[in-house]
Amino acid sequence: MTSIAVVGSQWGDEGKGKITDFLGTTADLSVRANGGNNAGHTIDFDGKEFKMRLIPSGIFAAKLGAVISNGVVINPKVLLGELNNLEKSGIDTSNLKISNRAHIIMPYHIMQDTYEEEAKGNLKVGTTKNGIGPTYMDKASRIGIRVCDLIDPETFAEKLRFNLERKNALFTKVYGKPAMDFDEIYNEYVEYGKRIAKYVCDTSLYVNDALDRNEKVLFEGAQGIMLDIDQGTYPFVSSSNSVSGGIASGSGIGANRIKTVLGICKAYTTRVGAGPFPTELHDETGDKIRDIAHEYGTVTGRPRRVGWFDSVALRHAKRVAGINALSLNLLDVFSGFDKIKICVAYDLNGKQIDYYPASLKEVEACQPIYEELPAWEEDITGAKSWEDLPEKAQAFVKRISEITGIPVVTVSVGPDREQTIVLQDPWTL
């Protein structure tokens, strides 16, 4: 069995798309296991750039194709838009598989997301308003509409009518908003069901069969561990489990079928939206990192908050997700800096701690304790091997590995697939 689960080890936007693209060239099957179209990644293929929110990168190269599994919530309009864009560019999409157990994001989920965020006022969490949270809410309430329902017009009509009665009561009586029309939604979405039906199957069987044959299976995690609904900075989190355990359940496989958990991290830290961020920079250094690295959200376009590398948060991610290898991205950003800082612990009301508190109040009171390292002058974007990196850059990478207790297996020195230095092949771990 050869399998890798790629997980974001920070607050998302760590460069998972690049690493999954890099590993996807040698993977036999690529699987998306959680989240929805709130998570964007950019893939460069055959000289063209593709911005994807739902379809895994394996659609481009993997022998067995790409899977959208049961843990994903699917906006069929977004999905079909991505499929159309791929097909217009000559990409074969026939090898896409969609789980019959995945839940569907409905128009009322998007409206509910918007209304609830507006009603929260100062307590809003910065949702992307794509309906992700309300869809997972309905899933947990056991009233959600799944792919297998959408492709059965009779079942779909029954479940839509049941849900819309309740949503319209909520919209009109609580939020003072207009009701939504059954016929309009049904006619639009039943057509979506017809168009995606050919891709639908029991993806749990498909993925497990591939693992049984010892195919190389790449599981593409979305968001980041610090956005996990249980282990992240609650309530400023996503609505799904982004840890490796969530990838297992979201793919319909046993947890012991994931061989390597590859944590993706930047040489610094970023976050989009509200929520605690102990190492955040509010000075020229933060602005400099943001400008050099073009730190703006793939989906939202919002400027990302920037801070120094936080080893406390990463050790937390290691513990709860079982990370046993690291891919360190954007090392090239620090060329020309005088110094780099790594947060090694927190000061919480005069006490040094090395763990990430659950209490939001405690996290906000934490002050980072830094270790300072010298940066390097050289441009490293052309480095092809470990030996090509300056000694100071090597020292920084080694220190990250020492502090976190995780071996660094790849180092990224630029956005292109070729700008990836492999210290150890993740498929051989």
Swiss-Prot record:
Keywords: Cytoplasm, GTP-binding, Ligase, Magnesium, Metal-binding, Nucleotide-binding, Purine biosynthesis. It is found in: Cytoplasm. IMP binds at D13, E14, G15, K16, N38, A39, G40, H41, T128, R142, Q223, R302. Its main location: cytoplasm. It is an enzyme of class 6 (ligase). One of its GO terms (cellular component) is cytoplasm. The active site is at D13, H41. Binds 1 Mg(2+) ion per subunit. GTP binds at residues 12-18, 40-42, 304, 330-332, 412-414. GO terms for molecular function: adenylosuccinate synthase activity; GTP binding; magnesium ion binding. GO terms for biological process: 'de novo' AMP biosynthetic process; IMP metabolic process. Pfam families: Adenylsucc_synt. It catalyses: IMP + L-aspartate + GTP = N(6)-(1,2-dicarboxyethyl)-AMP + GDP + phosphate + 2 H(+). Signal peptide: none annotated. InterPro entries: Adenylosuccin_syn_GTP-bd (IPR018220), Adenylosuccin_syn_Lys_AS (IPR033128), Adenylosuccinate_synth_dom1 (IPR042109), Adenylosuccinate_synth_dom2 (IPR042110), Adenylosuccinate_synth_dom3 (IPR042111), Adenylosuccinate_synthetase (IPR001114), P-loop_NTPase (IPR027417). Its cofactor is Mg(2+). Mg(2+) binds at D13, G40. Pathway: Purine metabolism; AMP biosynthesis via de novo pathway; AMP from IMP: step 1/2. Disulfide bonds: none annotated. Homodimer. Belongs to the adenylosuccinate synthetase family. PANTHER family: ADENYLOSUCCINATE SYNTHETASE. This is Adenylosuccinate synthetase. It comes from Lactobacillus delbrueckii subsp. bulgaricus (strain ATCC 11842 / DSM 20081 / BCRC 10696 / JCM 1002 / NBRC 13953 / NCIMB 11778 / NCTC 12712 / WDCM 00102 / Lb 14). The lineage of its organism: Bacteria, Bacillati, Bacillota, Bacilli, Lactobacillales. The gene is purA.
